[in-house]
Amino acid sequence: MRIKVLNPEVVMKIAAGEVVSGPSSVVKELVENSLDAQADSITVEILDGGKSLIKVDDNGIGMEEEELELSILPHTTSKIFSIEDLYKLKTFGFRGEALSSISRVSRMKMTSKPPEKEVGTMLEILGGKIIEKKRVNSSNGTKIEIMDLFFNIPARRKFLKSDSAEGRYVTEIIEKFAFTNNINLTYIRDHKEIYKFSSDMDLITKCLKIYPELKRDDLIEIEHNDSLCKISGVISQPKVGRNNRTAQHFFVNNRYIKVASLYSVLETGYGEILEKSIHPYGIIFIEIPPDMVDVNVHPQKLEVKFTDEQMVASLLKKVVRESLKKNTHFTMEFINSNDTIDLNKKTSSFSVQNLYNKNESSQKVDFSQNPTNTDYFENTDEFFNNSEIEDLQEEQNHFDNSYKLYEPSKTFDFKGFEYQKNQTFTPVEKINSLEKLRILGIVAERYLVVEGEDKLLLVDFHAAHERYIYEILRENVYEKGGLTSDLLLTPVIIALDEVRKGIILENKDHLEKLGIKLEEDEKEIIVKGLPSLVKIDDAERLIFEIADDLRISNFDQQPNILDKNLATMACRAAVKTRDNPTGMETLLNTIFEKKLLTCPHGRPIMIQITFKTLDKYFGRI
């Protein structure tokens, strides 16, 4: 007989794997239990990314001896007693799975005492079985220590990421709890206090603590309250954001959720004043009657379903727009705020036209010169070692990747760009390196108008310059082992959030290969050297973007994170709209000589219209 009943121990370990994916999920479950126990002071401590130790200590209502023993049994809970209770839920937990699952895959120590008791109870549990029980002197509340996570499931333990990566995931969880609860919350990692939030700290102060790159004026408070739904929180000014959505967080009834469509609803609220590729900061709280939202649709309770998705979406968009109108000086041109949005529909990021003027000074850029001196092929003597870059593992389930990097071995596919049959300009799919060219001028402060032998070309000079720089950087990295650095006369001091800072420090050697030399200060990163081959005007933004590239990278999906970082560097160094470029002939000749069709991110460098097409248009033939 091939079908057999699984051993109960196997069943429990499989079930535990649904709840406990790693140290961060353990921290999430334990802190939620503390909050459900009415704690207003919680301390979380981890060692080695939570692999060796996770300790959560609270001052909640505690548990008596009998309750403590029951709490580690499967499906035991104080939160619900009937299926109807699911639809009026006001607690984080309800399934009675967390402590049972955690206890079965770790060495656990639990100490708890209700305020009315003189002494507490301590249990030691090994793989789900109580091995010691005794009465102890303890403070009010509950302290749970988790040691050697997955010690009895080696296959699961080996899939944990590095200590630093797992520690980052825990840090992200702590930040979300800090946003949503007015409690005293302390977070200690490897004996170092990372965060200490007090119960009287307002949301903007928390944002500034978690995201030190922000200033108070960068944030706008939002508020709406009616009989069915309350929306509150903070969003950022339209010109303040990241190149991904890692600073957008949504909470429904104080529970952190990941509903993909809400991200697009937030950005739709900005309309056309949101700069292309900028994703705003947003800490959004939605309070709704419990019977209008189902939280029992995901093993880790990260997804929810609304009974009226359209009401929530329209209201959120309206609140964002009204707050922006009140707090910004931009011309607001929005579509109808009552347009329908399906929260269950999978969405992708979008970009909109920028309607405001940037007060950027024009700078002169000379394309006729190499990024620095003419002997750039000889001035690098550092070589890579063959060790892999650590910790650039998958975080794609947390963040979306906004573009696909150009791959030198592949031909660019123009199918992604939609050109109607009756359009006169078409993408350039083939380049004749011997063609004679004549530059006629610049239009719209960003396009070269070029006369070819049988055609007229429009060239995006930012895309062209970006690809030109990328090729030089890539040649130096792959043929000479890395980029040389120029030491800065005045080091750049950068305030980074804990997650970005951790990523940068973990990959310090990787950044040195990119020509970036840095040191750690207690609160900041100090950049002391930048690559010699390119001029970087905004080192802070470059560091932010490299950190984010590393954060969302995956070696399976993104074979070479180094190429992606070089593309980011080239983009930052390339000439921008409204700059005053010189040496355009040199740039154009290089593009044609090397037959470069796209920028490093895959966007076309030029489009064309043949003179024959023009003659037909004007009735000459």
From Swiss-Prot:
Keywords, ordered alphabetically: DNA damage, DNA repair
A GO BP entry: mismatch repair
SUPFAM superfamilies with a match to the protein in the record: ATPase domain of HSP90 chaperone/DNA topoisomerase II/histidine kinase (SSF55874), DNA mismatch repair protein MutL (SSF118116), Ribosomal protein S5 domain 2-like (SSF54211)
InterPro entries listed in its UniProt record: DNA_mismatch_repair_CS (IPR014762), DNA_mismatch_repair_MutL (IPR020667), DNA_mismatch_S5_2-like (IPR013507), HATPase_C_sf (IPR036890), MutL/Mlh/PMS (IPR002099), MutL/Mlh/Pms-like (IPR038973), MutL_C (IPR014790), MutL_C_dimsub (IPR042120)
UniProt feature coiled coil, ranges: none
One Gene Ontology CC term in the entry: mismatch repair complex
Annotated GO MF terms: ATP binding; ATP hydrolysis activity; ATP-dependent DNA damage sensor activity; mismatched DNA binding
Mitochondrion as UniProt keyword: no
DNA damage among keywords: yes
Family: Belongs to the DNA mismatch repair MutL/HexB family.
Role: This protein is involved in the repair of mismatches in DNA. It is required for dam-dependent methyl-directed DNA mismatch repair. May act as a 'molecular matchmaker', a protein that promotes the formation of a stable complex between two or more DNA-binding proteins in an ATP-dependent manner without itself being part of a final effector complex.
Cross-referenced HAMAP family: DNA_mis_repair
Protein's UniProt name: DNA mismatch repair protein MutL
Annotated organism of origin: Petrotoga mobilis (strain DSM 10674 / SJ95)
Gene it is expressed from: mutL
